[in-house]
Amino acid sequence: MKFFALFIHRPVATLLLTLAIALCGVLGFRLLPVSPLPQVDFPVISVSASLPGASPETMASAVATPLERALGRIAGVSEMTSTSSLGSTRVILVFNLDRDINGAARDVQAAINAAQNLLPSGMSSRPTYRKVNPSDAPVMILTLTSDTYSQGQLYDFASTQLSQKISQMEGVGDVSIGGSSLPAVRVALNPVALFNQGISLDEVRQAIAQANVRQPLGNVENSQKSWQIKTNDELKTADAYAPLIIHYNNGAAVRLSDVATVEDSVQNSRNAGMANAKPAILVMIRRAPDANIITTVDNIRAAMPELRASLPAEIQLDVAQDRSPTIRASLAEVEQSLVIAVALVILVVFLFLRSGRATAIPALAVPVSLIGTFAAMYLCGFSLNNLSLMALTIATGFVVDDAIVVLENISRHIEAGMKPLQASLQGVREVGFTVLSMSLSLVAVFIPLLLMEGLPGRLFREFAVTLSVAIMISLLISLTLTPMLCARLLRAVPKRSQPRKQGFNRVLLAMQQGYGRSLKWVLNHARWVLLLLLGTIALNVWLYISIPKTFFPEQDTGRLMGFIQADQSISFQAMTVKLQNFMTIVSSDPAVDNVNGFTGGSRTNSGSMFISLKPLSERDVSAQQVISRLRIKLAKEPGANLFLMPVQDIRIGGREANAGYQYTLLSDDLSELRTWEPKIRAAFSKLPELADVNSDQQDKGAEMALTYDRDAMAQLGISVSAVNALLNNAFGQRQISTIYQPLNQYKVVMEVDDAYTQDVSSLNKMFVINSEGKPIPLSYFASWKPINAPLSVNHQGLSAASTISFNLPEGTDLSSATAAIERTMTSLGVPSAVRGQFSGTAQAFQQSQSSQLLLILAAIITVYIVLGVLYESYVHPLTILSTLPSAGVGALLALEWFGAPFSLVALIGIMLLIGIVKKNAIMMVDFALVAQRSGKLSAQDAIFQACLLRFRPIMMTTLAALFGALPLVLTSGDGAELRQPLGITIVGGLVMSQILTLYTTPVVYLFFDKLRNIRRKAPERDVSLS
């Protein structure tokens, strides 16, 4: 420690070094981005393919399977799922965390190219991919409303103008629009009028397509001039299409308006969107992978004036939902907790030292260490988030520890009559190794966490590095700045001054004397203390097994997502009514601020809702409590269910589910899967540990199955392709022509009039023109009957899959839910052909359970190795680590007391305790070893004196750590559910360990000393016997 004497003799250099650390930290702080949590986004790529009119089974076998075979060969794919519905397939690829998404995207494109020859030739476009997780909640939702413009026109503005501009902004990954579709000219045909005129639907289609043509025409020129040729070959509005002649009947022209209603409408009339019960278009913005939420939202907010200016004055563009306010509020709460923690720690130091000068010395270590850490955070690419700021809050109790130990030892020498400069040199020489051991062993706790793969390792890497850097800076400050300031600020006092025996110090002295008397008794009854230590180890095991567990604390982000699931045969009109009813019920809750939702598209029995709650200061209930009371009201709506779940910052997997947790059934036999899924789902629904149980298996959709009489068709001169074309023209909203405009392209959509789509009897009015040109009714050669058919087909890997989703009732933990599911699956006797496994967050939870004990054990072994190297001993590290069982018991009991489940955040608290509580033992053992090796004291006298002399710094460091964590326990604002488990664990562990380790550590020290003496005497006896 002679090196550090240089800093005592060179105060200017020491001060400038300290200032440099602080200035670098200030600069780093200004450059740090802000986010709710560290970047832990799994690389997810969504591949989409379409084949209009194809059934879900056709899409699954002809499109999804070839794509899955090609995509499944890509390296680093951790999960591959697909959903095939009417005319569309989506394949979701989730990659390992260490996979670069850009490299993965190149592999995905290559796989799509390789599968192209295996896909149906009728696909109008190649499959496309997006680097975005479709299951992620939008970071911002905008709404467009107007009293003058139609929904289709609003959608056009959103798609043509807003979407393009927003997509170009930094951080934006995907912009999706819901609530309607692009404008279109819709041709609603009257099949009876067509039959009377002898005109087929296909003839109408061809006439429209031939009347609207865009193709190169060329130019004419002479020696002086050139003219381009332009014609009126394009029709752009409904009024232009209506007078179109499509047929001549006995010389009389039959116009389109004679057999159809032509109007300007939308491409897909089966879409609806609403914002607070008012028709609206929803613009849902998702961030790009690894993009910062706050930066992305700020970019969009800054562009809002420009976006509004680009729209007509009659259109209102509003922000319906924004993720950033609760993030900012949560970070403000953490910053407030940090300031309170710093103040409390300094107060603790002042109470013990009773001197402004003496208090200022360790107090300087706190801001310098914390501020200097910001520089390292910036260099490591970290952000200011809940976890990194929690690390700094906890660090306030640690960074002062080393300075306290150095200051207390120097003060003891000054009170003994030594001059301040000499006391500083002697004091730092005596405890330099102690503070080095304390700091290095604390940092060593995080080495296994830094090496840990997967989500927990990535999630808490910033926490571990941030805290470790703060501790190492504090170590540097305590060995440089602290002794230098002690040599110049502390006054030489020949003996303890009278004021130190007053007030708080009198209480402390009485406690120390009482501790000395009780310690003598304990050392004389060491056997009982050892039994107590063994009892705490056993209690640790029992508490860990029995305590409720979860993966990550459920956050209250002020936002809810709702998923509507209605009867599979419901019509679009009825589904729109359900959406309105649900929005009315949700809006009536006093904690709800606004509600937005949409329905329609390829699956008319589903819908989505986005709910913003009032700020936490304006409501007296949590998001989960809002869901619980709404669940009762929503259950009264017949024929449909609305499943609500709070939006979380961590979303695992890419599966779009109606609830927060999933259990997936897999089978190579689709019929077996469809047989067992309802039974399993029904059994899950009866479990009290689960709520909102639902499934993505949609195999009960209403379908009208037509059976062709092929012999009759052959006699009548009718082909199957002609009949299929008839049905597609009549009921498929077929896009038959394209209208080209400067900013976009629009479609001409043809189908029969709505009056003929309301009932199955309309099929009797359909006819086909045979090879002789005669109209033949469909009923002449076809029969039909209603059957059940799937609305979607799901795969995971290459197996048929069905995912059962569920939420947790209020007060239920995830470990109880997963255990109940496993018991139920065992009792049902599910055949081996059907396999079950947890997915998403539930799967990550189960995987983390198997690694938690290994992580704790690895941390203990790492600390043991570091201490063994520092002390050159196998035994003394065990003495120091004997403090851990009591801390574990205190932490687990505190979690039980507060009703908090054991989560990843609590696990980090346990690991922190491994580093914290051993500090007390290090201070005792280090002093005892020095005294014992000097030969002046026996082992018992050495450890007894060490306990008494180190009582004050032990109390100071423990209370500093305790008060540093206390604001996390008492916090109640935004993000409190994330911070409290860490604070509860640390405070509980510190309180219990402080009570027990003051007695168990000296007993264990003497126990190992006696064992060592016995081993030494054994060889001596062997020699004498020989």
Swiss-Prot record:
The keyword Transmembrane applies. It is a multi-pass membrane protein. InterPro entries: AcrB_DN_DC_subdom (IPR027463), Acrflvin-R (IPR001036), Multidrug-R_MdtC (IPR023931). Keywords: Cell inner membrane, Cell membrane, Membrane, Transmembrane, Transmembrane helix, Transport. The chain crosses the membrane at residues 12-32, 333-353, 360-380, 387-407, 431-451, 463-483, 528-548, 853-873, 875-895, 897-917, 953-973, 984-1004. It is found in: Cell inner membrane. GO terms for cellular component: plasma membrane. It holds the Pfam family ACR_tran. GO terms for molecular function: xenobiotic transmembrane transporter activity. The keyword Nucleotide-binding does not apply. Gene3D superfamilies: Multidrug efflux transporter AcrB pore domain, Multidrug efflux transporter AcrB pore domain like, Multidrug efflux transporter AcrB TolC docking domain, DN and DC subdomains, Multidrug efflux transporter AcrB transmembrane domain. Part of a tripartite efflux system composed of MdtA, MdtB and MdtC. MdtC forms a heteromultimer with MdtB. Belongs to the resistance-nodulation-cell division (RND) (TC 2.A.6) family. MdtC subfamily. PANTHER family: MULTIDRUG RESISTANCE PROTEIN MDTC, PTHR32063. This is Multidrug resistance protein MdtC.
